[in-house]
């Protein structure tokens, strides 16, 4: 006679969502630091291993994803998506700019193990631009070894355009390599709960529980900035496009797209939801069938906010002065970084080192910032995805409605 036992708490966590596992690791790390400081410091090795794995996989991830995306671009698709594409890019840049303003208004700091003496901060915008240009012409192998993400991007874009003229077998190989690297990233991400357990335990054991308040403040800045973009910046852009009250459309998209994306934490998984909402709004099928998948790739307002806020938090922590031109340049760089964050779990976090390079911050310190992002990622990633995905359908609807209004007005004049 066999008896069936209901799955215990550990089994449910082991087979549950990554969000629940990370939350469990966060709670267990806090408890261990509170109960035993020596034990908490000992398990810090788990966090060190996790950060090391991130450092190893991030450069090759950026190279393969960008190269495969450009090489496999499909020609001949003619749809009326230029206004939507413009809104995507303008919205992402506006989000990064709002994040800069928010970060200056409410500066946050992080608890990093390295001191400001480990870096050589730039003196101004001229030195930053010189550093960016020199990074672009770096040897590709050297760029991969040193985590020079700007150089990696340049080589990935160049190779991607060159491979467009290659045969389909070569393009398929590049795409398969990209999928293989993405699989490795997902494998590393699956160990995030263990890594976060070690990071939280060792951090609290060495710096005290006051560290939590620093992360809480950082979360408030991140989520507050995302709310500002969702409820102020995006409505302004939509009003500029349709010239009428934008909030019914904004709230509809947040309710029927954003809420679902908040829990799935995947813009790609939310594409069918956005497609259904576009059909419900009677939008042009030829337009939204292209713009929604495109938006899931390049419309990354939430990612731009995450990259900007965490980068400026690291800058504040290290005491690096930031002038206005450099802050504006950061908005542009964060926007470009955000466009490369699609389809990867924690993609926006893994692209933070690229923005950190602007300020002379080493890859080691930048990856500590990434680790902080994973600690707060339970809420940050959900809010980021909700903003990203709901904005896809919002801007698509705004552009389509503006075009319908233009055609209707033209018909009335005739």
UniProtKB/Swiss-Prot annotation:
Transmembrane segments: 16-36, 46-66, 84-104, 143-163, 180-200, 218-238, 300-320, 332-352
Pfam families in UniProt: SDF
Cytoplasmic side: 2-15, 67-83, 164-179, 239-299, 353-414
Keywords: Amino-acid transport, Cell inner membrane, Cell membrane, Membrane, Symport, Transmembrane, Transmembrane helix, Transport
Periplasmic side, ranges: 37-45, 105-142, 201-217, 321-331
Transmembrane in keyword set: yes
Membrane topology: Multi-pass membrane protein
Primary localisation category: membrane
Any single biological process term in GO: threonine transport
Primary role: Involved in the import of serine and threonine into the cell, with the concomitant import of sodium (symport system).
HAMAP family: Ser_Thr_transp_SstT
Family according to the record: Belongs to the dicarboxylate/amino acid:cation symporter (DAACS) (TC 2.A.23) family.
UniProt-recorded name of the protein: Serine/threonine transporter SstT
Organism: Escherichia coli O1:K1 / APEC
Gene that specifies this protein: sstT
């Amino acid at each position: 006679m066999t008896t069936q036992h209901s799955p215990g708490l550990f089994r449910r966590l082991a087979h549950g969502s990554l969000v629940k596992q990370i939350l469990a690791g966060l709670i267990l790390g806090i408890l261990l630091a509170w109960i035993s400081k020596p034990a908490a410091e000992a398990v810090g090795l788990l966090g060190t291993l996790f950060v090391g794995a991130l450092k190893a996989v991030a450069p090759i991830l950026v190279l393969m994803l960008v190269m495969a995306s450009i090489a496999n671009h499909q020609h001949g698709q003619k749809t009326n998506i230029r206004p939507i594409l413009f809104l995507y890019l303008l919205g992402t840049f506006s989000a990064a700019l709002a994040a800069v303003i928010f970060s200056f208004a409410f500066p946050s700091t992080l608890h990093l193990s390295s001191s400001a003496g480990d870096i050589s901060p730039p003196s101004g915008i001229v030195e930053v631009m010189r550093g960016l240009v020199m990074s672009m012409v770096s040897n590709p192998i050297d760029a991969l070894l040193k985590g020079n993400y700007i150089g990696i991007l340049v080589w990935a874009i160049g190779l991607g355009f060159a491979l467009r003229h290659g045969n389909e077998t070569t393009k398929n190989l590049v795409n398969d390599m990209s999928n293989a690297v993405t699989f490795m990233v997902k494998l590393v991400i699956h160990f995030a709960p263990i890594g976060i357990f070690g990071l939280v335990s060792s951090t609290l054991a060495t710096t005290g529980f006051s560290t939590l308040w620093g992360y809480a403040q950082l979360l408030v800045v991140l989520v507050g900035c995302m709310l500002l973009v969702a409820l102020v910046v995006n409505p302004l852009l939509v009003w500029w496009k349709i010239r009428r009250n934008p909030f019914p459309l904004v709230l509809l998209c947040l309710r029927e797209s954003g809420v679902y994306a908040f829990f799935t934490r995947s813009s790609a998984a939310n594409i069918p939801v956005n497609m259904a909402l576009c059909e419900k709004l009677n939008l042009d099928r030829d337009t939204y069938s292209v713009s929604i998948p495109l938006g899931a790739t390049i419309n990354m307002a939430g990612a731009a906010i995450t990259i900007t806020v965490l980068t400026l938090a690291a800058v504040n922590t290290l005491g690096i002065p930031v002038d206005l031109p450099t802050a504006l340049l950061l908005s542009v760089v964060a926007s470009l970084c955000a466009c490369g964050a699609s389809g990867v779990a924690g993609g926006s976090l893994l692209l933070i080192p690229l923005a950190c390079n602007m300020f002379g911050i080493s890859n080691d310190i930048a990856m500590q910032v990434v680790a902080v992002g994973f600690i707060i990622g339970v809420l940050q990633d959900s809010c980021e995805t909700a903003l990203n995905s709901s904005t896809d359908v919002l801007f698509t609807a705004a552009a389509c409605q503006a075009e319908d209004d233009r055609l209707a007005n033209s018909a009335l004049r005739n």
